[in-house]
């Protein structure tokens, strides 16, 4: 536009001299034509720019409308209840089986010196399906996630191992969990059996937590954990449950058991890592029964009611050269348990003439194991278990009402077991294990030679393993 005005101004300024000196009208007309051409040229360019501006504004308006429609659609979708097709949890299956050769009858297995839980044992002879699992896990919404683990037993029964929800949005390192879950006490208990380094649980887990040969101690209740915001790993946990499982029995209202624990851990250089902890479990069993025999060999049912307190110390040390565990690594693991029980022991409690008496016991047990991966995929392990029946005070015996032989399972004994294993893992989804145990836990003094061949296959997604 400035050039147009300049041209017009120039024409006005020089128009008179041009007219004055023009030789004829054709020269004047030529100048006018040039001015007209300049005007038309600039007008066309202005029109083109105005058209481009309108097109750009139209496209911007269209984009804004599309964004608004997309936002509306997203809000509608989020407000709509999730359909069955939208439910997409992580699903995994654990296939496990064993072949066992046992020199003693597994049906007569008892650990001497301790009130027996209902499911103590060594497994089954011959081929067995083992403890296969079906697991579902998913985030429920931005605030919770859920997990369901169903165990398929060798006797074709189905058991809900875990069914819990856990918070995702709590701040300051806090997480809360509710439902049925493996307790966080000790070290081994939170780890599923297919991730253990040996086929079966330590003897201390059987007599103090009632896990059986391949189980975990679980509860129906609530759990609260806190991870400290420090370079050193520090975890504090508290739990309250119904106490249905040994050492409780759930025969009461309200809270039947509660637990507290503290775990700390960290790195030592670039090749070592450790974790240690202390845990406390308290239960209030009421009429907790167990089957036994009296001095004459007659079957009887005894029951205990009172208070059961368990203290656990655990420690794990891992070594991998410069943090690389692919070729070689070593893991040292151990736990110590000390239990105090006080209350009333009813002799032959289901008869018409039960004989009650005060009861107290101070007992302990431990295990220590080491597992060495000496080359990729191959591992070798050793474990030692030992229990001490400690001090057991049976009122009926102390007061001369009944002879000690009426409580044969509670006579002093030191159960122990030595285990060696070799396993091979073609991949992270499969493992084959050969295990031998020399078991001296029976009070009869008859030792058991236990050979186990085990396979483990993992199908589908699975989470990271515990430290």
Protein language model features and the residues they cover:
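Bacterial N-terminal signal peptides that target proteins for export
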Residues: 1-7
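Conserved aromatic-histidine-acidic binding/catalytic patches
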Residues: 34, 212, 250, 303
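N-terminal periplasmic/intermembrane-space "pro-region" immediately following the signal or transit peptide
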Residues: 21-111, 115-117, 233, 454, ...
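Outer membrane beta-barrel
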Residues: 80-246, 252-270, 280, 317, ...
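C-terminal segment of classical bacterial N-terminal signal peptides
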Residues: 13-21
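Intrinsically disordered, low-complexity acidic Ser/Thr-rich regulatory segments
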Residues: 76-83, 120, 301-302, 406-408
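Outer-membrane beta-barrel pore domains
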Residues: 164, 197, 272-467
């Amino acid at each position: 536009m400035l050039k147009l005005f300049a041209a017009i101004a120039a024409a006005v300024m020089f128009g008179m001299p041009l007219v004055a000196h023009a030789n004829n009208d054709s020269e004047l007309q030529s100048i006018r034509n040039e001015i007209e051409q300049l005007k038309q040229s600039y007008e066309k360019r202005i029109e083109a720019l105005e058209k481009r501006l309108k097109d750009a504004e139209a496209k911007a308006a269209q984009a804004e409308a599309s964004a608004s429609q997309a936002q509306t659609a997203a809000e509608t979708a989020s407000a709509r209840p999730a359909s069955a097709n939208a439910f997409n949890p992580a699903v995994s299956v654990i296939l496990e089986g064993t072949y066992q050769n046992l020199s003693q009858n597994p049906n007569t297995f008892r650990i001497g010196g301790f009130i027996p839980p209902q499911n103590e044992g060594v497994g089954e002879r011959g081929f067995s399906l083992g403890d296969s699992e079906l697991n579902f896990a998913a985030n429920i919404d931005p605030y919770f996630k859920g997990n369901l683990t169903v165990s398929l037993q060798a006797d074709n029964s189905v058991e809900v191992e875990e069914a819990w929800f856990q918070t995702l949005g709590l701040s300051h390192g806090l997480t809360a969990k509710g439902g049925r879950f493996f307790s966080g006490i000790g070290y081994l208990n939170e780890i599923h059996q297919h991730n253990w380094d040996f086929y079966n649980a330590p003897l201390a887990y059987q007599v103090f937590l009632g896990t059986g040969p391949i189980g975990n101690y679980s509860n129906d209740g609530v759990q609260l954990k806190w991870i400290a915001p420090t370079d050193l790993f520090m975890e504090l946990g508290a739990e309250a449950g119904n106490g249905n499982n040994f050492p409780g029995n759930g025969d009461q209202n309200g809270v039947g058991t509660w637990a507290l624990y503290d775990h700390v851990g960290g790195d030592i250089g670039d090749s070592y890592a450790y974790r240690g902890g202390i845990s406390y479990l308290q239960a209030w069993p009421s009429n907790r029964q167990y089957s036994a025999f009296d001095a004459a060999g007659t079957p009887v049912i005894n029951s205990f009611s009172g208070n059961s307190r368990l203290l656990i110390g655990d420690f794990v040390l891992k070594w991998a050269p410069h943090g690389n565990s692919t070729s070689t690594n070593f893991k040292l693991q151990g736990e110590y348990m000390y239990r105090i029980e006080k209350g009333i022991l009813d002799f032959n409690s289901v008869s018409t003439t039960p004989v009650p008496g005060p009861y107290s016991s101070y007992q302990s047990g431990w295990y220590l194991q080491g597992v060495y991966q000496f080359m990729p995929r191959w591992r070798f392990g050793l474990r030692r278990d030992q229990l001490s029946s400690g001090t057991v005070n049976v009122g009926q015996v102390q007061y001369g009402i009944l002879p000690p032989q009426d409580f044969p399972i509670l006579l002093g004994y030191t159960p122990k077991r030595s285990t060696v294993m070799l396993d091979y893992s073609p991949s992270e989804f499969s493992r084959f294990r050969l295990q031998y145990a020399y078991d001296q836990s029976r009070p009869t003094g008859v030792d058991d030679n236990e050979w186990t061949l085990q396979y483990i296959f993992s199908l589908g997604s699975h989470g990271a393993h515990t430290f």
